[in-house]
A protein has these predicted regions:
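Mature-chain termini and adjacent capping regions
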Residues: 1-131
């Protein structure tokens, strides 16, 4: 079995055109990483949850907290089946040593492989050392 996933919201509204979809407000989600006994916490103002495949889209004021890492952005797509988090739009990554700004961060929750990139190949990811 893989990771465990819990989604909480202050409000939820079922999509009448597709009852598998629930629109969420004031969302908090937890991804419990089985292999490492660690937790990724995701919060956002809004969410769109698929009750069949558990895929969730988070939007507006998205925050990821994982160990000493903090990532903020405006849009996050989480696929439990693919074990993939993709956060985009005004992405800022902070840890104890660096602040990084990019267009997109992709994180595989199983392998921890991370891709950080810009949409425009002529632009560069901005990295600043805190120390």
């Amino acid at each position: 079995r893989g990771n465990k996933y819990t989604v909480l919201a202050k409000e939820g509204e079922i999509d009448l055109s597709n009852t598998d979809i629930i629109f969420l407000k004031d969302v908090t989600a937890y991804i419990y990483l089985k292999k490492r006994m660690e937790t990724i916490t995701i919060t956002s103002n809004f969410g769109k949850y698929n009750s069949i495949n558990f895929d969730t889209i988070f939007s507006k004021n998205v925050i990821i907290d994982y160990l000493d890492n903090n990532i903020t952005g405006e849009y996050l797509d989480y696929s439990m089946k693919k074990n993939l988090i993709i956060i985009s739009r005004n992405v800022v990554y902070k840890n104890l040593e660096n602040i990084l700004k990019a267009d997109v961060i992709e994180l595989n929750t199983t392998t921890k492989d991370t891709k950080i990139f810009m949409y425009n190949s002529t632009k560069k990811v901005n990295i600043k050392s805190i120390n």
